[in-house]
């Protein structure tokens, strides 16, 4: 489909605005995936706070120029689906990783987080980041365990002191 200059500028402006507020980005190749499966992926992405769009590679290069996602430029080859995580850095990576397990033709190319290129083989680094709620839960359980351990040690010391007396 041929795009005129105004359409291209509108696409670059829209995706650039999203990229400015994004925490991470993941690039994938969706050749061979059925429309129904892609619709499911897009729906899951909206629910997870992930912005997804298929954009021409030349336009994507303009979008990422001067941003933390510039390291992805070399991955813009062939049909490119880009996903930006808006709420949690690992959301898009987790979504694409799970989708790739169920769809063999879906290929994750790379990801970017804080200006660092993460190859597809290491996408788990980003996908396994805990969500904010999970991190809080882990912190609270650690704090709770530490307090309980301290209480047990204090009671044991009091018991030992009474036995010695």
From Swiss-Prot:
Give the record's keywords alphabetically: Ribonucleoprotein, Ribosomal protein, RNA-binding, rRNA-binding
GO BP field: translation
Q: Which InterPro entries match?
A: Ribosomal_uL10, Ribosomal_uL10-like_sf, Ribosomal_uL10_bac, Ribosomal_uL10_bac_type, Ribosomal_uL10_CS_bac
Indicate the family of this protein: Belongs to the universal ribosomal protein uL10 family.
Gene Ontology MF terms in the entry: large ribosomal subunit rRNA binding; structural constituent of ribosome
Where does the record locate the signal sequence feature? none
Q: Which residues form a coiled coil?
A: none
Which Gene3D superfamilies does the entry link to? 3.30.70.1730, 6.10.250.2350
Which species does the entry assign this protein to?
Answer: Pectobacterium atrosepticum (strain SCRI 1043 / ATCC BAA-672)
Q: Which PANTHER family match?
A: 39S RIBOSOMAL PROTEIN L10, MITOCHONDRIAL
State the protein's name. Large ribosomal subunit protein uL10
Record function comment: Forms part of the ribosomal stalk, playing a central role in the interaction of the ribosome with GTP-bound translation factors.
Q: Name one GO cellular component term.
A: large ribosomal subunit
Q: How does it assemble?
A: Part of the ribosomal stalk of the 50S ribosomal subunit. The N-terminus interacts with L11 and the large rRNA to form the base of the stalk. The C-terminus forms an elongated spine to which L12 dimers bind in a sequential fashion forming a multimeric L10(L12)X complex.
